[in-house]
Amino acid sequence: MASVAWIESVVTSDVKGEEAIAVMGADHLTINRASDGKLLGKLGGFNPNQEQYWRSISSPVADGNIILCPYARGDTLTAVDIDLLAEGKGKDAILWFRDDLGSDVPTPAAGGGRAYVVSDGKSSKGVITCVNLVNGKSEWTVQLPKSRGGYSSSPLIAGNHMYVTQENGTTFVLGPLNAVQPAIVSKNVVSDDEPFTVASPIPYQESLLLRSRHKLYRIVE
């Protein structure tokens, strides 16, 4: 069993009308009631071959009643209906599964019925894929410029654009997200370009906070 995990919990607001916490780790997804920690649902089977080194870094992400679970070192995505899992449906709560897409380190972003996955594998580094959360189909992909830098930061959605930061601190802005085929609209380079920038950018009062290896930047228009 893979037991090492570097993840954050995901808080979802509507599991049987109650706030709940979803955690992915040790080859399982668990849903616990936020008020008292009571277990509401549990799903295993993410590591059927008992691989020893499938640590969890990328966190699950929720949108509505669907929670998306990246696993298998970036090789798989599993979408789960939270309500069905809380009803004890087990594997029948799985809406869809893909083994051709994933994210090992960056946590996907989600909203409006879609998930945005930043792939960080050797052959797919810098590929952004928009996935329909209901049926699991890819709606579009964008390849960021290839470089030696990988991707550890999680993407940020602000308005109709997405911000994706490389390990060298360079941030790409992609959009508009509701376009048939979004494009890179901006490339922002910082002076501290030493690897590794791993912190995710966050919005702050009409600006963007970016933590590189040595510096903290506040970026405004």
Question: Which ranges hold each PLM region?
Answer:
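Noncatalytic, solvent-exposed loop/strand surfaces
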Residues: 1-221
